[in-house]
Amino acid sequence: MAKGSAGDAPNTRDTSFKRPKIRESCTHCSSQKIRCTKERPACARCVNKGLLCQYNISRRTGTRRHSVRATPEPETTISNAPTSSVAPDSVKIDGKRSPAMSDFALLDGLETFDNSLWHQPITTDIQDIDMQYFDFFDPGGYQAEPEPINSFDIDSTLLCGTSTAGYLPELDAEASTRPSSSSSPPSQRSDGGRATTHGGGGCISTALQIFSELHVSSSACPIAAGAPSHNIREFDHVLDSNRAALEKLSSILDCPPCCHDQEVLTALFLAVQKALSWYSAALDVAGDGEPTSPSSRVKSPPAFLGSYALGAQAQTLARAYVVMAQLQQHFQPLLAKLQRISSLSALGARSSSTTSLSSVSSLQSSTSGSAVIECQKRALQEALEDVVAKIEGIKRG
């Protein structure tokens, strides 16, 4: 009888103890709301994706027990199911006893990261990186690398066709092929903190706005008499504003429906001529130590090379050097594109007017528009010749 009573004691203890219930779905399938195939020790989805398949303890405990067990559950219950593992948040795992399990537990949530973070585009093209070049006047004022001094020699080759009356000298044969900052996307350009988008008014509104920013009203104008005077500008500000204006005008020429519109081309020619007038005024700059003439619109602080102050003649030559470099890199490619598009637009207007001879009004408007553009071409060529002549005069000294 004693043996029988002793053998019945373990059975009574086993019936009162309930083993924790393992969930039927693994951790990864339940977190993704996907039906688990429930294979043990690892489901098919985790095996295919190379994931660590874990079957956690179910948190549904059912009815609450009246008495709480004073002694903690033995850790040997986990060893009874060697094919299943327990989540780190439900059971603490000793890293000394099971280092492999603790390492995998740290990697459990890596699949929740967005893989697109590892595929972000990385800029490797040096043309997309804004590299500043040394400037005599402002370290951040001019970013174009100037040409050597001997590049002041001007070729007598015509840039445009022979249909125009004026002669437009070619500044540099390599300027049209040199990469310009206007070829980069508008989102990657710098314009002194201002946006380079055209706004809601369209291309013609942008061209007229650039013309208005570059225009200086006459002091005798009664309408502009009460406006604040901004006639005198800094030399580096002229370079920055002209470069930004030429980049915007070049982007307008990339708009297919607007670049062939004669009204837009007229506004573009006006804005380009205003930018060229500021280059001409920058060559007549008066330094702080020089007397300022009444007609001078640009001033420049003294220039230094280290602690050495440049003389008046050296400063004048340096300004001509920088203006010539910016003409080669920004002005000449825009002018070549403008000449090519305006010539194609004029040919298209003539062909469309000859096919519809019944429309007399369209023929007259296209003829008058082409005549206006031709006049603007000649005026722009004459202004460019004056600027080149000033640079040659400064070079000869």
Curated annotation (Swiss-Prot):
Q: Which superkingdom heads the taxonomic lineage of this protein's source?
A: Eukaryota
Question: According to the UniProt record, where is the region Disordered?
Answer: 63-90, 173-198
List keywords of the entry alphabetically: DNA-binding, Metal-binding, Nucleus, Transcription, Transcription regulation, Zinc
Matching InterPro entries = AflR (IPR013700), OAF3 (IPR050675), Zn2-C6_fun-type_DNA-bd_sf (IPR036864), Zn2Cys6_DnaBD (IPR001138)
**Feature: compositional bias, Low complexity:** 179-197
Asked whether the keyword Iron is assigned, the reply is no
Q: SMART domains from the entry? A: GAL4 (SM00066)
Please state where this protein is localized. Answer: Nucleus
Tell me yes or no: is Cell inner membrane among this UniProt entry's keywords: no
Q: Which Gene3D superfamilies match?
A: Zn(2)-C6 fungal-type DNA-binding domain (4.10.240.10)
The feature table lists the DNA-binding region at 26-53
Q: Which GO terms describe its molecular function?
A: DNA binding; DNA-binding transcription factor activity, RNA polymerase II-specific; zinc ion binding
Matches recorded under Pfam families: AflR, Zn_clus
Q: Name one GO biological process term.
A: aflatoxin biosynthetic process
Q: What does this protein do?
A: Transcription regulator of the gene cluster that mediates the biosynthesis of cercosporin, a light-activated, non-host-selective toxin. The perylenequinone chromophore of cercosporin absorbs light energy to attain an electronically-activated triplet state and produces active oxygen species such as the hydroxyl radical, superoxide, hydrogen peroxide or singlet oxygen upon reaction with oxygen molecules. These reactive oxygen species cause damage to various cellular components including lipids, proteins and nucleic acids.
- What PANTHER family does the annotation carry? MONODICTYPHENONE CLUSTER TRANSCRIPTION FACTOR-RELATED, OLEATE-ACTIVATED TRANSCRIPTION FACTOR 1-RELATED
**Which named protein is this?**
Cercosporin biosynthesis regulatory protein CTB8
Q: Which organism is it from?
A: Cercospora beticola
